[in-house]
Curated annotation (Swiss-Prot):
Coiled coil: none
Keywords: Nucleus, Phosphoprotein, Repeat
Chief subcellular location: nucleus
UniProt KW Phosphoprotein keyword: yes
Listed name of the protein: Protein NRDE2 homolog
Per-repeat ranges for HAT: 159-191, 250-282, 318-350, 355-386, 608-640, 788-820, 860-894
Native species: Schizosaccharomyces pombe (strain 972 / ATCC 24843) (Fission yeast)
Region (Disordered): 1-61
Length: 972
């Protein structure tokens, strides 16, 4: 999501109070007003009136809507609660320059505010300089990362920037149609400007802001020239880059206009539709209705474009997109819309959109043509507005299996009455329940509503009409199915999905990783709660299901498939969805996931009908009787539950019955899984026998010596034709080495890593999978065999967490080993180094793993965790991640003494996450704990004006302020 830190785009203003006896504009503010005029030169007409008096207890937000007023005591009535609004409270037209400090969060790109806690931070930065393994040391594995160069080297390099600019300019003259050259020119110009500033005065905050503005203006000028020269696919790249930069420079109205102009001129630029949605939902001025209308407009255009193509209308000469690409764009927008609705509190609407589209994808009646025409709308609206159970609801059978005149009344178990409370505290206590336990869509017909019912619980066809799509591509429908489960809290995506650029950019990034984070409720009584179960966020790895079952074998690692703290009705709906989809469509991967889900539910005693579990498992195995992957999963789960004999029988049956169907890759995978299960029960002889069966299929006596087997495995390593084959062979070779002791494990692992790198697959997902399995083997050796050899395996773990910082398994085992030698700080130091040097999803992942490290080592100390969050929230690409802010606010709620920085922190949180109700709720919680009820009321009003979904209300006569606490939403 684009950053919204710039001065030209309004933010929520601070909650700074203005006392009745203090003039908000005094001589002490002259310096600030001077900066005000300089920074907002492009908005001269919108400057604040200088004659505002203390009797005018309201401020006009000239950068937001014209009628945007904050009402003071007895001056204006508090606005009556309404569901939509044309104005937004709290838009700050300017950003304040704050005093420089070495620690703390950065406010609006200016400088850091020091955050004071009741305990001093004990993080020892000097330990960063400690030497680790060096070249030449036995077992050293070089890290494939770029290290920051020495400052003197950077200065030397910067002297050549002008020369590089000249060379690039000459290349542009020869090849003006290459976008890469124009972007390179922008980068060189930016480096030149910042290098000159750094050498002149690196402490001048105003100068730095000026350089940033100048750099942006220069790059925009370059891109404007480039857009006239570049054509084709490169043109879309440049347009996207141009609009991204421009959104930091222009006003929100101008940016919105630019986006619309480009999209009208180039409707085939599907990536721009995504950028448009990201921009719109990331700006604090836009209300919920504004954003929903924007999504509706995008959907209408893309669906019309898809309909025109299906009608065989003549393509535009510049239209190079396919139907598949358009459907991809629609799917991407659909997921983003549902996330947006969920974040704003409209969980019922988001769930209903998923339900409706799942009915169209998998339960579309055969007698209807897949076309969104009048016949379709008449039939589906009748189905949706009836009392018939919909997808994932109890007794749901699918739209195609329901007769037109059929209706079945469902039980309504949830109250939908709107509560009205007399205090903010009571309102918060009741409203926060819906944050952690959102209610389902009401299954009772809207015609039965009473005057006190909450209308947003009842979703009629008109509410979802603009957001339903008939996907014709099986690949898109397949992907949408897993997006639904990710929305429910099971972030599993088949490896094949990750090969697509749309899904790779979305699921490998922040969106996928955030599913693994523990919730803010993990913090109890001022401490980080004891170790929780963690979801493993690397679901796109090859052989992921097998890896996850292996992780389940180690109870101390405590991984899980889904969040057990989900609302009860969500878990029930998810289980019904699993059942409907597994038996209505052929999906081996989903069937395997469903088996794991059932086993975990049974293990955790969460299934109310345990006898039904075995019955469902048998039905799955019967339907997928010819599926090697499903039976392979079932065999491992039986072995995991202690049924070793049954597991042996299933593995043998796979080779006997499916021998003719087994591909070479599948054969390797099954043998690998079988051998690894033997390893985990310390059956060394059985493990060797299984591997010999693979190597010598004709030798029934299995008397071949181990040396010959080792030579064959080494030969297989030299002749791998694919990454997947190399992965399985390396794992089998590693298991063999563990069981035979013919070579040291560290040498074996180092050899396999070298093989990956020699093939050019040094940072591939297959190599990550290999690192994960090896971590588990090392963990098994340490916990079961009591064999600790940390000095030799430390380089392996350090390389693993650096290359694959999102991998919780590698981090957990690494932390375990270091804690045994009382070197708990080493993982922290490593995490800090990665956090400061990496970017994008890697930083996010590192932060998450650092959180795991804190829980594992110091569950009673959150200081390291706070410091890591400070650094993370300073990252321009990550500071808008609501999950960070929610946990950050929760910790500050428990640890921050006084109210000195509360205003600045809450303002920054609201400005960074303008479309997230959860952040607003945590801000209100923090303000109430600090006894700042008047400011909590303002945040409540902001929620109403933004259009967030609230299930309860505060009495109108309560929404007024004491004379001593009159508040004005003004610039910081």
């Amino acid at each position: 999501m684009p950053s919204n830190h710039n001065t030209s785009v309004p933010k929520f203003s601070s909650f700074n109070s203005v006392k009745a006896k203090k003039n908000p504009i005094t001589k002490s503010n002259k310096k600030y007003r001077s900066s005000h005029d300089q920074v907002s030169s492009n908005h001269a007409k919108s400057s604040f009136p200088s004659h505002r008096s203390i009797q005018s207890n309201f401020a006009v937000d000239t950068k937001g809507e014209k009628q945007n007023l904050l009402y003071g005591i007895n001056k204006r009535p508090v606005p009556k609660y309404h569901r939509s609004s044309s104005s937004v409270y709290g838009s700050a037209p300017l950003l304040r320059i704050v005093k420089e400090s070495k620690e703390g969060i950065t406010l609006n790109k200016k400088k850091s505010l020091e955050i004071k806690y009741d305990e001093e931070r004990s993080f020892d930065e000097k330990e960063n300089d400690e030497s680790e393994f060096e070249d030449g040391q036995q077992g050293f594995i070089p890290l494939l990362v770029n290290r920051n160069s020495d400052p003197s080297e950077k200065s030397t390099f910067s002297l050549n920037i002008l020369k590089a600019i000249k060379e690039t300019d000459e290349e542009i003259k020869k090849n003006p149609g290459k976008a890469r050259l124009w972007i390179k020119m922008c980068e060189y110009q930016e480096r030149l400007l910042f290098d000159e500033f750094r050498r002149s005065n690196s402490d001048d905050i105003k100068g730095k802001l000026k350089i940033e503005n100048n750099s942006r203006s220069v790059k925009l000028s370059i891109l404007e020239k480039a857009l006239k020269e570049v054509k084709g696919c490169d043109h879309e790249i440049l347009v996207s880059y141009y609009l991204q930069l421009g959104s930091e420079e222009w006003s929100k109205e101008e940016t919105n206009q630019k986006f619309e102009e480009v999209l009208i001129e180039h409707p085939g630029y599907l990536n721009l539709w995504m950028k448009y949605a990201e921009y719109f939902t990331g700006i604090s001025e836009f209300t919920f209705n504004d954003c929903l209308n924007m999504f509706s407009k995008c959907f209408k255009f893309l669906k019309q474009k898809l309909s025109d193509r299906k009608s065989c209308k003549e393509r535009e000469s510049t239209d190079v997109t396919s139907n598949f690409e358009v459907e991809e764009a629609i799917l991407h927008l659909l997921i983003r819309l549902c996330d947006f609705l969920k974040n704003c509190g409209y969980y019922e609407l988001a769930w209903s959109i998923f339900q409706a589209n799942m009915e169209l994808c998998y339960f579309y009646p055969r007698y209807l043509e897949k076309k969104l025409d009048s016949t379709f709308f008449e039939s589906f609206s009748k189905f949706w507005n009836s009392d018939t159970p919909k997808f994932s609801e109890e007794n749901a059978r699918g739209w195609c299996n329901v007769l037109d005149d059929e209706s079945s009344q469902q039980n309504q178990n949830f109250s939908s009455e709107i509560g009205i409370f007399q205090t903010v505290k009571l309102w918060y206590l009741n409203e926060s329940k819906f944050d952690t336990n959102p209610p389902p869509r009401s299954t009772m017909s809207c015609r039965k509503l009473s005057g006190i019912d909450d209308p947003f619980r009842y979703i009629v066809f008109n509410d979802i009409q603009d957001f339903i799509v008939c996907f014709e591509s099986e690949t898109i429908a397949f992907a949408f199915k897993y997006k639904f489960f990710a929305f429910c809290g099971v972030p599993l995506f088949p490896p094949g999905i990750s090969t697509n650029s749309w899904f790779a950019s979305y699921d490998k990034g922040i969106y996928n990783l955030l599913f693994g984070m523990a919730s803010s409720e993990s913090f109890i009584n001022g401490q980080i709660a004891e170790k929780n179960s963690f979801q493993f966020p690397c679901s796109i790895l090859p052989s992921y299901i097998d890896l996850f079952i292996s992780l389940m074998s180690f109870k101390n690692l405590n991984f899980k498939l889904f969040d057990y703290n989900l609302a009860h009705h969500v878990k029930e709906s998810m289980e019904r969805a699993f059942h409907q989809l597994v038996f209505s469509a052929d999906d081996e991967y989903l069937a395997s996931v469903y088996l794991i889900y059932l086993k975990q539910m049974e293990t955790k005693n969460l299934s109310e009908e345990k006898p039904q579990v075995n019955k469902i498992v048998k039905k799955i195995l019967k339907k997928y009787d010819s599926s090697v992957s499903v039976w392979n999963t079932y065999a491992q789960l039986e072995h995991l539950s202690g049924a070793f004999t049954m597991a042996e029988t299933i593995f043998k049956t796979i080779f006997q019955i499916h021998a003719s169907q087994l591909r070479y890759i599948d054969n390797l995978n099954v043998y690998k899984n079988w051998a690894f299960r033997k390893l985990l029960i310390n059956d060394t002889e059985g493990c060797l026998v299984i591997i010999k069966c693979l190597l010598f299929p004709g030798d029934k006596s299995l008397t071949s010596d181990n040396n010959r087997a080792s030579e064959m495995l080494f030969g297989m390593l030299e002749n791998c034709a694919s990454k997947e084959e190399l992965l399985y062979v390396c794992l089998i070779y590693t298991i063999w080495t563990h069981c035979t002791d013919m070579d040291s494990m560290d040498n074996c692992v180092y050899l396999c890593i070298q093989k990956f790198e020699s093939y050019g697959w040094g940072a591939s997902s297959e190599m990550e999978c290999y690192f994960s399995y090896c971590s588990l083997i090392f963990y098994y050796q340490a916990t079961t065999l009591q064999f600790y050899n940390l000095p030799k395996v430390r380089p392996f773990f350090e390389k693993g967490v650096t290359l694959f910082s999102a991998n919780t398994a590698i981090w957990e085992v690494y932390i375990f080993f270091e804690s045994k030698l009382r070197q708990e700080n080493k993982p922290k130091i490593r995490a800090m180094k990665i956090l400061k040097s990496a970017s994008n999803a890697v930083v996010t992942a590192c932060w998450y793993l650092f959180y795991v490290a804190v829980q594992q080592i110091e569950p009673t100390n959150s200081q390291y965790f706070l410091r890591t969050l400070d650094i993370t929230l300073n990252n321009e690409k990550l500071k808008s991640v609501a999950k960070f802010w929610r946990i950050y606010l929760k910790i500050l709620n428990l640890r921050l003494n006084g109210t000195e920085w509360v205003s600045a922190i809450t303002t920054k949180a609201l400005a960074s996450c303008p479309c997230n109700k959860g952040v607003c709720m945590d801000v209100i919680d923090l303000l109430l704990k600090k006894e700042m009820e008047s400011r909590a009321i303002i945040c409540y009003i902001i929620m109403l004006e933004k259009g967030f979904r609230v299930h309860n209300e505060i009495r109108r006569d309560v929404l007024k302020f004491e004379r001593g606490d009159e508040l004005i939403l003004s610039p910081n």
